[in-house]
Amino acid sequence: MKPLIVLNFKTYAESTGENALRLAMAAKQVASDSGVTIIVVPQIVDIFYISQHIEIPVYAQHIDGIEFGGHTGHVLAEALAQAGARGTLINHSERRLKLAEVDAANEAAKRAHLTTIICTNNIATTRAAASLNPDFVAIEPPELIGSGIPVSKANPEVVTGAVEAAKGIKVLCGAGISKGEDVKAAIELGTDGVLLASGVTKAPDPKEALQNLVAFV
Amino acid sequence: MKPLIVLNFKTYAESTGENALRLAMAAKQVASDSGVTIIVVPQIVDIFYISQHIEIPVYAQHIDGIEFGGHTGHVLAEALAQAGARGTLINHSERRLKLAEVDAANEAAKRAHLTTIICTNNIATTRAAASLNPDFVAIEPPELIGSGIPVSKANPEVVTGAVEAAKGIKVLCGAGISKGEDVKAAIELGTDGVLLASGVTKAPDPKEALQNLVAFV
Amino acid sequence: MKPLIVLNFKTYAESTGENALRLAMAAKQVASDSGVTIIVVPQIVDIFYISQHIEIPVYAQHIDGIEFGGHTGHVLAEALAQAGARGTLINHSERRLKLAEVDAANEAAKRAHLTTIICTNNIATTRAAASLNPDFVAIEPPELIGSGIPVSKANPEVVTGAVEAAKGIKVLCGAGISKGEDVKAAIELGTDGVLLASGVTKAPDPKEALQNLVAFV
Amino acid sequence: MKPLIVLNFKTYAESTGENALRLAMAAKQVASDSGVTIIVVPQIVDIFYISQHIEIPVYAQHIDGIEFGGHTGHVLAEALAQAGARGTLINHSERRLKLAEVDAANEAAKRAHLTTIICTNNIATTRAAASLNPDFVAIEPPELIGSGIPVSKANPEVVTGAVEAAKGIKVLCGAGISKGEDVKAAIELGTDGVLLASGVTKAPDPKEALQNLVAFV
């Protein structure tokens, strides 16, 4: 099985505005060359620009569980979809939501036919998130985020535990992923792919970093 | 003096995506015809699309007090500026921020040369917001939002009190504004303009509503 | 089976300070007379006063998922336990928590041997909350809170759906409960009891209201 | 002038429950012996126990800007006052509030005759907080909290700047305070006293730490 690579652009200088477009282009090329699906997750303000120029799945970093109405400053599913987004992260560790909001965000995204990835921090919250019926859950142990130590190596039990707790909902794993062998390990532990950020976006050559990531396939 | 009209698109169906573009076009025409400055405030995901197509000042509905870095799902000043935004609301009643965040958001926006409008709910918070040195404060008594009763009529003392409390920082007023006479009253009470939303966005003919709004000038 | 009555004091004048003590006394008498377990849930600042004077299970309205440390203004499990609390609500509709916080709060409470009741708003979040393994989940459809219309009558399917989704975790239901027949209906729908507030605390005679509540047993 | 010492108990094991009572007793003795006013700020659940047993001003760590009503899990001014609290921190760095909430909390506290201390993180937010007319502002530069480096030494300009920005509202300073000379420096920079926590609560002998703190007077 080919893994899914979800590349979170966060708010790094290297992945904002023009740089975001460039990074998305690199991701598209690597995806085309390798046959691996790479999803790019730019800042919300950059979604339209990227989806307009590049044929690659673009996801949002956040969505709110709202409907049309008076919700200044919030992120509306229908607006994301119209701008070209095809999915969204929900409850990322840097943008946690209340339990009822996670559910409402997941439902709002589905209403607009957006694929949903609910992020979680441990096995218990993975079980809870999976019970809300998203398309994916993505487990990222907070102590490993940005550590450079891949979760698949540091704590394989949390990954296999998450896969079991998800009861059939597809699982991604994140935190510390930067090499092809990390992706391979993630797949071998039962996940469908990885969620990563700085390992690629802040690499000296992001395209090369992506190529290395998919090289094992 | 000509008033400033700040038109908040919120997340209404009538002001999302294609509809947002259409509404911005109407605003541009009314602004050109009347000589009144109209600022449009679409959802963040719609900023690029509008600023790319229409010559009109576009502001964001929200900004976070962050710098480049790991801030998934947050709104970065530099990303807004690159996408064409020229200013931003801060602390809107539907997206309130912590005190330290209001300050940080105001500083982040200035760093990217974005004009700042801090929203407030009463005279005391207007005084506090103005002391942070934004370009504007916008007072909106929460009990009047969406009421159809203009703050300039229902509670003129809160407007004059806000102007006094702002100590030279320019003041906008909002809540219940929908007619030219409301704008006129706001100016006579010492403000520089108005912040409004549903009175225009949900009007049967938004362009006509904008024309009526600027007709008294 | 005898139902469990959980009486949330909220922050009403009728259930603050001396009034809280009086209400807890009434609850104790009704519990003794009827053999029904009544749990009182006063404000956190009133827990010590009540637990010191009255032999009745006292729960907290909120707990934070923290450990000993620098957490000014937060609610620590061990401090609640030392003050006499024997359990706690988590994620009440008026004090919603992030998903990871619900999990952490539930774990913190267990660490201090406090019984946990996670509050939820619909079937999906009940399933998610139950998967975190609390002692109870309490479903309260937000549209019925304070309505005077009992959830057991207005929407029995949401109650039976919650009982099924909870997969063996005990379920309470709330919103609109004020009479003995509401409690009876709740039990017949498969719950272990009810969570209620204003139906008793704001009754002309709270003791009589409690007596009516347990009269059907 | 004699300084004001505000001792935040946070949620440390050393200052919870029975330990909180013991620490408050030590504070009382040092206050009596030295003539310096020491205010103790225990966890909310410990306020009643301490105020019942010891004659010392007890403040809350947090208060919500609410009135009597349905506010489960929130902190009500009148309940604090009935339990013996005589003042409260507002917007502590570990429990930040939205701007409108800071104002509402300050007003709620005044309504119940509680002395208010609004905490701030820099000169700008000190100016904003002071404009809300609390009894005190307490500036704590976040980078120095728990550092052991007293703000009065590391950054005296931020203290004098805060005193100036407060325009007559009394100022406390915090972060890194642990010795008598830090208190002395704080007073010389124009403040009325200090807000401190771990320097005393986690000292091997808290009473001795407090004696050292007031020794310079």
Residue map of PLM features:
Chain A
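Glycine-rich phosphate-binding active-site loops on the catalytic face of alpha/beta enzymes
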Residues: 86-97, 136-149, 189-209
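Short, conserved beta-strand edge motifs with alternating hydrophobic and charged residues
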Residues: 41, 117-120, 138-140, 174
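Structural motif
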Residues: 33, 83, 112, 132, ...
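Conserved, mostly hydrophobic/aromatic
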Residues: 10, 43, 80, 140, ...
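Residue-level detector of anion-binding/catalytic polar loops
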Residues: 57, 86, 115, 135, ...
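Conserved N-terminal beta1-alpha1 strand-loop-helix module at the mouth
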Residues: 1-75, 116, 124-134, 201-202
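Active-site-adjacent beta->alpha loops and helix N-cap segments on the catalytic face
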Residues: 16-23, 42-52, 68-78, 93-108, ...
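Catalytic cores of alpha/beta
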Residues: 120-133, 173, 177-194
